[in-house]
Amino acid sequence: MAIRNIVYSDNEFIRKQSKKVVNFNESLWELLDDMKETMHKANGCGLAAVQVGVLKQAIIVEVNNLFLELINPEILEEIGEQCEVEGCLSVKNISGYVKRPKQITVKACDRYGNEFVITGTGYLACALSHEIDHTKGILFIDKMEREYKPKKKGSN
């Protein structure tokens, strides 16, 4: 496993559409392992392959001790709406309020090509939606309602 360099929002590569994964092999497994290590090193909760310079529809998400790898993720259903503060490992020094589904159902494959369906709510729904957007070249700042500015300590 290796830590990979993160592609930032000032690099036009991050806006490219990712391609479907067709080969579920050691190359993909190594990418997924590297993505997990890179995400942990950067203290993130999700990462898309495009964020480490690979145009493959592969994302990882880790929320509430649940670690997921989703290959070729496809949103089947979105229910409700929530507006929460988001950040991104590819977008430096900006956080903002983004509307996302309250519940999301996604079809994807695991690292071996086995198809599965998962439904996530709350923070998991946000994370899945955010990472799937990356596969389409969309960043959270494209959907941001307004920037989040934390209050400074000692201010009322």
Task: Go through the PLM ranges and name each one.
Residues 1-156:
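Positively charged
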